[in-house]
Amino acid sequence: MIESKIITPERAIEFVKSNDQIVTGLGCSEGRAFLSVLHQRADDLKNVHISNCLPMATLPYMEPEYKDSFFLDGWFYSPVMRRMHKQGNASFIPNNLHMAAMHRLDAIKPNIYVGVCTPPDKHGYVSLSTGNTYERRMIDAADLVILEMNKNFPRTFGDVELHVSKVDWLIDADYDVPALPNIETSEKDEKIGQLIASQIDDGDNIQVGIGGIPNAVIKALYGKKDLGIHTEMLTSEVARLAKAGVITGDRKSLHRGKMVTTFIMGDQELYDFCDENPAVMVLDGNYVNRPDVIAQNDNQVSLNTTLEIDLTGQCASESIGPIQYSGTGGQADTARGAQEAKNGRSFIALYSTAMVKNRETGEREEKSKIVAQLTPGAIVSLQRSDVDRVVTEYGIAELRGKSVVQRVELLIGIAHPAYREQLLFDARRMGIIGGH
C-alpha cells in the first residue's frame, strides 16, 4: 500500500498553491525534508501561510527575499521565529495550549498538513512519534496530508497511531531526530531547584518543562519515590529520572503507571527511552492540558518560569516589553489545573535579577525581575489570580489567597536585597498599597 504513496520532497511541494494554509508538526516533527525545498516554489507562489510551533531548523524559505511567498504564523516562538518576526515574515498566534488547535481551526481551513511519522507496523499503522499537541486534529481537518516517514523517529503510543490509509503522500526521509543541547544548571538554578524540590513529596505528580531551572528541579528529586508525570513536554531529564526508578506512576489517580505527555523534545537518550515504551502515553494537547483533566491528578505539581512579575503577581512570561519572545504555551493551563487538584501546587520560578540591554545606551545593566510595574507593553501570560507560589534564589512567596498588601510584602522578601527598598517605595508611590 505505501509504495504507491511515496514521493520525493520536490514532488510534494508541487501540491502547494498560492494562498494555501499549511500546518506543520511541532518542533522535531516540522517536516524538514518538505520545508527544505519549499523555497524552490517561491516564484510561483504568493501569500502561503505556514502555521507552526517551535520550529527548530533555519531553512531557505524563511529568508526575507521570500516573504511575499511564505509567511509564518507561530503558536510558540523559537529563536528561528524571533528572527523571522524581526524581519517581518512571522507573527504570533495568541493561545492557551489546550485550545490552540480548535481556535486555529476556527480561523483557518488547513489545505496541507506536513509532519513526521514512523514506518507502518504490520497492521498498517504509523506513529506520529514525538507529538500530538495539535497534530492529529490538523491531520483530520486538512485537505491533503503529507508525512515524512522516518525510521529514526521513536514509535510512541497514545493518540498518535494513524492508519496509513489516512495519509495521502509519504516522503521517505532518513535524517536524525532533531535534538536539543543539554542545558547546564547554574548555582542559581540549583538553589531554586532545591527550594521547589523541598515542597515535592513522594507520590506527587509532576509537570515540568525545559531550561536551567526545570532541569535543576528534576536533578533535586532523586531522593523521592513513586513520582508520576502528567506534563505538556517530556524532557531528557525526566527520562533519566524515570530510568533511575524515581518515576513509577504507582500512586497516580489518573493513568496510573503511565507518563502522560503531549510532545517529546530533548536528546537521543530521550528518544531511545520513548521508543516502543508502553509507559509513555502521547495524548492530544486538548486533553493533556485541559485544566479539568489536570485537576483529576491528586497531588499535581506544576512548574513554570516567567520573565518578569509585578508586585501583585502578574506574570509576563512570553514577551520582553511588547516584543514576543516565546509563547503562553501551557502555563495558564497547568497553573490552573494544578491548583484545582486535590493537594495541588503551582510554582512560578525566576531569577531575582537579569542583565538587560539599555535601549538608549546599548549597555547591559542589572535589573530586578520583580517589579512594581511590568515593562510597558509586556504581555501578561498568567494573571495574578492564578498565581500560587513564586520562587527565586532568595526563597518562596506563597501568594494563593493573599491580599495585595501581603503579596507586595512576600514578593519583596524574595527580591534581590539591593532592590527591596526601592520596590517598597514604588509600591507606595504608585498606590499599589496605601501609606507613605
Model-identified regions with their sequence ranges:
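Conserved alpha/beta enzyme-core scaffold
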Residues: 1-436
